[in-house]
């Protein structure tokens, strides 16, 4: 893998004996293990991932390792973001301290707390974003928030990702006249 990010933006460290990669940048630091079949080296400004042969498993692991390291570099330099929106009459969100408070038609408000690595940004009453440096963690947190009230297929009410298309169903057919 050839990483094109500048060396002065982030610091990287590879421990070949423990099969770990550590990346530090302005948005934090991330560590990751990689498969023992792969070889990861730092050469100048680049992180180089090589595979021992062209077997299917080695090719798959090569792409996985390269992508994971790339996501780590992007995460510590730029960060990741998932934008979500709320649709439905009376549904809304607000931020109280470090908690996201969701009013979703339940008898009680649903509260979701920020973590050390995940931040929540509320744009308005119907739009909010999940921010962080770890792509997997941001996606998992966004999925957990979305699961509090996923979009239903009849009216489309619920929490959805911005740009997500929800397949709508037709309601009950009326009695024939």
Could you say what each language-model-derived stretch is?
Residues 12-14, 38-42, 91-93, 119-120:
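A structural signal for short hydrophobic beta-strand segments in well-ordered beta-sheet cores
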Residues 36, 42-59:
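Short, charge-patterned binding micro-sites
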Residues 52-135:
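Extended, positively charged loop/linker patches that create polyanion-binding surfaces
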Residues 163-177:
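Short, low-order "capping/linker" segments at domain edges
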């Amino acid at each position: 893998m050839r990483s094109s990010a500048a060396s002065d933006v982030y610091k990287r460290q590879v421990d070949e004996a423990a099969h770990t990669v550590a990346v530090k940048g302005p948005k934090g630091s991330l560590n990751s293990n990689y498969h023992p079949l792969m070889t990861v080296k730092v050469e100048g400004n680049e992180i180089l991932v090589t595979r021992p042969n062209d077997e299917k498993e080695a090719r798959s692991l090569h792409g996985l390792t390269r992508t994971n390291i790339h996501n780590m570099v992007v995460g510590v330099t730029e960060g990741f973001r998932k934008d979500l929106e709320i649709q439905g009459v009376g549904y809304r969100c607000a931020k109280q301290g470090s908690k996201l408070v969701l009013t979703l038609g339940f008898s009680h408000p649903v509260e979701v707390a920020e973590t050390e690595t995940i931040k929540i940004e509320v744009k308005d009453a119907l739009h909010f974003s999940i921010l962080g440096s770890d792509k997997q963690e941001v996606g998992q947190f966004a999925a957990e928030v979305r699961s509090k009230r996923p979009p239903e297929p009849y009216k489309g009410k619920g929490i959805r990702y911005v740009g997500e298309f929800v397949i709508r169903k037709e309601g009950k057919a009326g009695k024939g006249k």
